Regions:
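Metal-dependent phosphoester-hydrolase catalytic domains
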Residues: 1-7, 112, 144, 158-169, ...
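N-terminal, active-site-proximal structural segment of metallo-dependent hydrolase catalytic domains
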Residues: 1-79, 91-95, 239, 248-249
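Structured beta-strand-rich core segments of catalytic domains in phosphoester-bond hydrolases
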Residues: 3-10, 60-132, 138, 220-227, ...
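Active-site beta-strand termini and strand-to-loop segments that position acidic
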Residues: 12, 102-105, 125-130, 212-213, ...
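Residues that flank catalytic or metal-binding motifs in active/ligand-binding sites
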Residues: 15-20, 96-98, 120-122, 129, ...
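Active-site beta-strand/loop signature of hydrolases that rely on acidic residues for catalysis
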Residues: 18-24, 44-69, 133-136, 152-183, ...
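Surface-exposed cleft-lining segments at the edges of enzyme active sites
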Residues: 27-33, 111-114, 137-146
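N-terminal post-signal-peptidase region of extra-cytosolic proteins
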Residues: 36-44, 86, 199, 228-231
């Protein structure tokens, strides 16, 4: 059926929760030649603020490196008014590199777990009142590592949240346009099929929001999109596009 919210812009809907994911590319814009002090935190923060998520998973964040001698997630938190929760994945250029979450309300607890990769990877779980939100950035080189990453997260949920009945969401850059079939036995994609990695000769969808189906949660997707805004050209802010999902509260 047609989505009744299509064509209405991306304003927040009444009685809804907005989840999002965004690979920030170190806030450096869309080009691939990284370097020092190229970051534009105002641009990245503007996209996040226009999206107005309740919680957003962010990938590729420097913290006090030689490239960016600041806490990039804190820079975004300062500009958006959201709460930052950082998850270091590797030591990098004299500092840290990793993923994070920005949220409007503080989570009850957080947990960081290890995932496989030629470059070390993590999943970062945050429990809120109405749901669990897991941010991640999977290995970019190996289908096997990505499949194992799904297994590790699923096993962690089964071991630690067996009695949990609320929705559990997974959001991030999964670095593949084809998710492992085995993973889709426990997870359902609820985000848009639009391409998210586009400044390339072969655009693809590699950024997702999924819901865990193992606990048969009650949820209702109202809308999902790769948003665009008149106020800023999202194509130039990162080499990825942001993804949002609106759910009934």
């Amino acid at each position: 059926p047609d989505n009744p919210y299509d064509g209405q812009g991306y304003d927040r809907l009444p009685n809804s929760v907005r989840l999002a994911t965004y690979n920030t590319h170190r806030c450096e814009g869309w080009t691939q030649n990284s370097g020092t002090d190229r970051a534009n935190y105002n641009n990245t923060a503007k996209v996040i603020s226009l999206m107005d998520p309740d919680v957003i998973a962010l990938q590729e964040l420097d913290k006090n490196t030689t490239w960016h001698q600041t806490d990039q997630l804190q820079e975004l938190a300062d500009r958006t008014g959201m709460r930052p929760y950082y998850c270091k994945t590797i030591s990098y250029r004299g500092g840290d590199y990793g993923i994070g979450i920005l949220c409007k309300t503080a989570p009850k607890n957080t947990y960081a777990g290890d995932l496989p990769g030629t470059e070390a990877r993590k999943f970062f779980l945050a429990e809120f009142d109405g749901y669990i939100f897991i941010a991640t950035h999977f290995c970019h080189q190996s289908d096997e590592n990505r499949q194992r990453s799904f297994e590790i997260i699923t096993e962690y949920i089964a071991a630690n949240y067996a009695a949990y009945t609320k929705p559990i969401y997974l959001a991030g850059d999964l670095n593949t346009s084809k998710l492992p079939a085995a993973a889709l036995e426990s997870w359902k994609i609820i985000s848009t099929s639009a391409n998210t990695f586009v400044n390339t000769s072969s655009p693809s969808r590699i950024d997702y929001v999924l819901v865990y189906t193992g606990n048969s949660p009650s949820y209702e997707v109202l809308r999902t999109a790769v948003p665009s805004y008149e106020e800023i050209n999202v194509m130039t802010v990162s080499d990825h596009l942001p993804v949002l999902v609106d759910l009934k509260k």
